[in-house]
Amino acid sequence: MTYVCTACKLKFHTFEEFKIHVHLFHPELDKLVEPFPDRKEYRLSIRLDKQTYNMLLNIKNNIQRDNDIGLNTTIKALIYIVNYLLSKGYTIDELTNLPNKVSVIVGGDK
């Protein structure tokens, strides 16, 4: 079983190793990573209000359409979205506790 960091393509044998990697190298995503035990994957979970979600979905779709490289672009777009929200003053705690949860599985081997 391996866990792949979609942001930088590194592979890890355990979820704990993966989580440490995210904590050290992608700290802005640290609290967004959750284990997904039944499928041994990891999940990026962000809770957004509907208006913000729709705005960010449009950004993601535009980025994905422009680059047309599938999942990796989607992940880059989500990381961009998280960084954008952080730059606008949201905290990670706020992003993970807003009412509407948007969960996207961003990697991991089956």
Curated annotation (Swiss-Prot):
A zinc finger (C2H2-type) spans 3-26. InterPro entries: Znf_C2H2_type. Keywords: Metal-binding, Zinc, Zinc-finger. GO terms for molecular function: zinc ion binding. The keyword Metal-binding applies. This is Putative zinc finger protein ORF110.
